[in-house]
UniProtKB/Swiss-Prot annotation:
Cofactor: Mg(2+)
Protein name: Phenylalanine--tRNA ligase alpha subunit
Binding site for Mg(2+): E254
HAMAP family for the chain: Phe_tRNA_synth_alpha1
Subcellular location: Cytoplasm
Main location: cytoplasm
Species lineage: Bacteria, Bacillati, Bacillota, Clostridia, Eubacteriales
Gene name, Swiss-Prot/TrEMBL: pheS
Cofactor, how bound (note): Binds 2 magnesium ions per tetramer.
Reactions the enzyme catalyzes: tRNA(Phe) + L-phenylalanine + ATP = L-phenylalanyl-tRNA(Phe) + AMP + diphosphate + H(+)
Species annotation: Clostridium perfringens (strain ATCC 13124 / DSM 756 / JCM 1290 / NCIMB 6125 / NCTC 8237 / Type A)
Keyword Cell inner membrane: no
Entry's Gene Ontology BP terms: phenylalanyl-tRNA aminoacylation
Length: 339
């Protein structure tokens, strides 16, 4: 048994010294020291030895194990260092090769346009207000002069969570909340996400962005509304832009209008963006309805005001000539990298 142990030791040491890579070393380790290795097999068979032989063989076997483990560790370190140096040698950097372009983050075109619009209105003295996206029915409808059974309450247009709670269909509820808690003068915008129960297509999305504005004070007239929005249009689209107002109907304003601007693609000459008309619809607006003021605790005999609202997605599409709203929400970097 002792001769066999010495023989295993000599053979193993020879194999270890000849090992040139980590795989060979692992194979040798398993061959001699593994669960079914040659040295392990001898240790398991010591029960058949006499009492006199058992301690002698056991001591020798442990000495052989210690020698092999020490040698394996030393050779493993040397081999791994050699492999590392070989890898570094083969991975020489060619400094003449062009570098890899770093991916640089940028703002989404929606965010860019929102920031630009907010900057313009803040420069005109407007404050930015925010409110909940999950809104009470009262603030989304009744406070804004949209009573029960009004067509705008149709389940086809609105996401109802329950009878009294909806996903806001506009950012106008923010205006109602501000009027309730703050006495005039009020000058604010309320940008944010809104929700409509619309089927997804090139021009409709169930989630989109709006920015609405409100001014309340004494002696506010339609001329103030017109001047404010014309100034915004010039700052947003350039000094040469022209605007016009068309009569319209909104339940929360009276009188109401829609504002058009000369097409900034063709400068009013007519193109596919403006459908040959030379004008593009930009926003809805009007003088705040007296009932809305009363609902929010403001005396319409003392105060008046105007309100307006933009579809931010529409502004982005018009500004950049985008013909499908879905492109704004698909996170396609080939598209987004153009902005």
């Amino acid at each position: 048994m002792q001769d066999k142990l010495n023989q295993i030791k000599e053979l193993a040491l020879v194999e270890i010294k000849e090992a040139k890579d980590s795989t060979t070393i692992d194979t040798i380790r398993v061959k001699y020291l593994g669960k079914k290795g040659e040295l392990t097999t001898i240790l398991r068979g010591m029960g058949s030895l006499s009492k006199e032989e058992r301690p002698i063989v056991g001591k020798l076997a442990n000495e052989v194990r210690e020698v092999l483990e020490a040698e394996l560790e030393a050779v493993t370190k040397a081999v791994k260092e050699a492999e590392k140096q070989e890898k570094l040698k083969n991975e020489v950097i060619d400094i003449s090769m062009p570098g890899k372009k770093q991916t640089i983050g940028k703002k989404h075109p929606l965010e860019q346009t929102l920031d630009e619009m907010k900057k313009i209105f803040v420069s005109m003295g407007f404050a930015i207000e925010d409110g909940p996206e999950v809104e009470k029915d009262y603030y989304n409808f009744e406070a804004l002069n949209i009573p029960k059974n009004h067509p705008a309450r149709s389940e086809q247009d609105t996401f109802y969570i329950n009878d009294n709670v909806v996903l806001r269909t506009q950012t106008s509820p923010v205006q109602a909340r501000v009027m309730e808690k703050q006495q005039p003068p009020i000058k604010m915008i309320s940008p944010g996400k809104v929700f409509r129960s619309d089927a997804v297509d090139a021009t409709h999305s169930p989630i989109f962005y709006q920015m609405e504005g409100l001014v309340i004070d004494k002696d506010i007239t339609f001329a103030d509304l017109k001047g404010t929005l014309e100034l915004f249009a010039k700052k947003m689209f350039g000094d040469k832009v022209k605007t016009k107002f068309r009569p319209h109907h909104f339940p929360f304003t009276e009188p109401s209008a829609e504002m058009d601007a000369t097409c900034f693609v063709c400068n009013g000459k007519g193109c596919k963006v403006c459908k040959g008309e030379g004008w593009i619809e930009i926003l809805g607006c009007g003088m705040v309805h007296p009932q809305v003021l009363r609902n929010c605790g403001i005396d319409p005999e003392v105060y008046s005001g105007f309100a307006f609202g933009f579809g931010v997605d529409r502004m982005v599409m018009l500004k950049y000539g985008i013909d499908d709203i879905r492109l704004l929400y698909e996170s396609d970097m080939r598209f987004l990298n153009q902005f």
